């Protein structure tokens, strides 16, 4: 098994605490509402949202795969950090054991925030992660972030 690490950052005009509430803590409800072209539903399979919780994320028709199951690994409300692993569905299967993801939202001096994202692809055997997988993951994250950001800008009273 190999582990391939991919790190990226994304900026937002939304303050870190507000973005954490919307994007991380309420993303299950917000994503299908603001980005139905990317996520059709999120179902809580097991747990209360904290570590160990299992969620099934379903994708719209025409998407490369029907669903993924995520396991919540950490929710740090103080440091705006969230870790989860994709454990089933989507790209996980013959070549990938799991994908571990960590998102940390950091406040910026201008009142916005930076999302620091670390993805670890745990491969089976000597398989390598394809550039298309990383690109698709980054595009999905960017789509969700911009949709949530637009929603928050249009609804200034939400998630304060």
Swiss-Prot record:
Compartment(s) where it occurs, according to its Swiss-Prot or TrEMBL record: Cytoplasm
Gene Ontology molecular function, alphabetical: abscisic acid binding; protein phosphatase inhibitor activity; signaling receptor activity
Domain of life: Eukaryota
PROSITE patterns: PATHOGENESIS_BETVI (PS00451)
SMART domains: Bet_v_1
Keyword Cytoplasm attached: yes
Chain sites annotated for binding brassinolide: 55, 82, 84, 101
Biological processes, Gene Ontology terms: abscisic acid-activated signaling pathway; defense response
PANTHER family reported in the protein's UniProt record: OS08G0374000 PROTEIN-RELATED, STRESS-INDUCED PROTEIN SAM22
Family stated for the protein in its record: Belongs to the BetVI family.
Protein name: Major pollen allergen Bet v 1-J
